[in-house]
């Protein structure tokens, strides 16, 4: 069975460190991931970006740009998730951060907080496929535009 999942994510890099969240549920549990997530009904891409980024990091986005789209296939034991990811570079004010809520309006927050992680320390052992795709992009890998298939994905 293949499940399509579309998510919108914010990328913030400062001093070669990536603003990450740590997932507490789902296929990327206990891995570093990008802040972001799924659209709500009638929500535009940038509205989702702003809402999800604030919910998961506490930071408000001052500006965004460089929209791009990638995809990966994550094969778990009984299903395959086709994860379509929309990336935006974001600018935030580090001086203003709201408290991150455990419980959101209609769901639980699936993030255990934020972490600034050196890009060189992010790899397949500790990161989601989204971060791995971002690293591929940042290294100017020409294959970044092609799909990646993760067979027998391990949930930590």
Predicted regions and their residues:
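Exposed loop/turn and edge beta-strand positions of beta-sandwich/beta-sheet ligand-binding modules
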Residues: 4-6, 28-30, 82
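Nudix hydrolase/Nudix homology domain
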Residues: 27, 105-156
């Amino acid at each position: 069975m293949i499940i399509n999942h579309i998510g919108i994510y914010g990328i913030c890099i400062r001093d070669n460190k990536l603003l990450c969240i740590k997932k507490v549920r789902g296929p990327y549990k206990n891995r570093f991931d990008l802040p972001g997530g799924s659209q709500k009904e009638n929500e535009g891409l940038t509205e989702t970006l702003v809402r999800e980024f604030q919910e998961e990091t506490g930071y408000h986005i001052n500006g965004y740009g460089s929209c791009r789209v990638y995809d990966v296939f994550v094969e778990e034991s009984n299903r395959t998730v086709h994860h379509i990811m929309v990336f935006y570079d974001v600018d935030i004010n580090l001086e203003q951060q709201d408290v991150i809520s455990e419980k959101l309006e209609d769901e639980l927050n699936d993030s255990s907080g934020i972490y600034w992680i050196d890009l060189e320390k992010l790899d397949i052992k500790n990161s989601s496929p989204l971060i791995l795709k971002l690293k591929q992009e940042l290294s100017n890998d020409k294959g970044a535009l092609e799909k990646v298939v993760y067979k027998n994905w391990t949930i930590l």
